[in-house]
């Protein structure tokens, strides 16, 4: 696991009040992690603040798994 994933994993676990080990790249926000639409909105906002990036709403709506968010954030940090 790289540092970026670890940061994302910690943030998601804290926001959803779950164990970090439940957050994997292939975890579905809704099915595996139990996030509802409000949780997802709050996660996107927290990721934007923490990572110093802007995630367009249309892109955020495409985030189904942690990998989706990770890959987008990684692409913005180059």
Swiss-Prot record:
The modification O-(pantetheine 4'-phosphoryl)serine is found at residue 37. Keywords: Cytoplasm, Fatty acid biosynthesis, Fatty acid metabolism, Lipid biosynthesis, Lipid metabolism, Phosphopantetheine, Phosphoprotein. Pathway: Lipid metabolism; fatty acid biosynthesis. One of its GO terms (cellular component) is cytosol. It is found in: Cytoplasm. It holds the Pfam family PP-binding. One of its GO terms (molecular function) is acyl carrier activity. This is Acyl carrier protein. The gene is acpP.
